[in-house]
């Protein structure tokens, strides 16, 4: 969801995408990887196949030390997906792309762990602590930004999102999102959150990817760009900011054109 922010820049070189990780739950990141399912090769899109493979291999954690960046932006919209969990503690995200490959998600003794369940929460919190400690060890925790967004309840013309998303589903998802944001806020300062008026989190009826509770009106993306630009300028003024390394639901790893090293 955060990736769409960059499409609304007037100056496309101001915020530059270094890397992008999607369809990967933080709950999956904190667990052991499953064996790569042969069905993954059925995913025709190279981008979508790579996205699924990165989740299964936990590439994000392995890549963290190898990228130079100014900001690491995460959002929790992809936490809406269920998980596939094997008895040995191996986990992956049951994204739509993985399920479309023919992966059943209930084979080899594994089972589905539903979003919003307490088991999901336990795995998610464990994953968050692993990500948090990794960023601390690399000295880049201050580069982390959390895009604190919620599912919208209405479209810009007053419509709802049924039959795909009911009001009850939206309310429940937002309650769980709020629980996750509250947990993260225990570990990082409020200045590292991007926060928005709820009116901006209204569903666009002309969004590139269609109508959805998390495909917002243009005003949201403009507000996000303003906050990201301000955060990037602040990070560049910080002592030693040009020397830090590392990357990043869906984490976005961004650099700023003002940083000559990037």
Where are these regions (language model features)?
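Short catalytic/ligand-binding loop motif for oxyanion handling, primarily in non-cytosolic enzymes
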Residues: 1-5, 80-85, 152-158, 201-206
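Basic, amphipathic N-terminal segments that precede the first structured/catalytic domain
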Residues: 1-71, 206, 228-242, 249-254
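Well-ordered, non-membrane alpha-helical segments in soluble/globular domains
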Residues: 56-58, 117-133, 167-182, 218-222
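A structural motif corresponding to the C-terminal end of an alpha-helix
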Residues: 126-145, 179-194
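Substrate-gating cap/lid alpha-helix
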Residues: 154-195
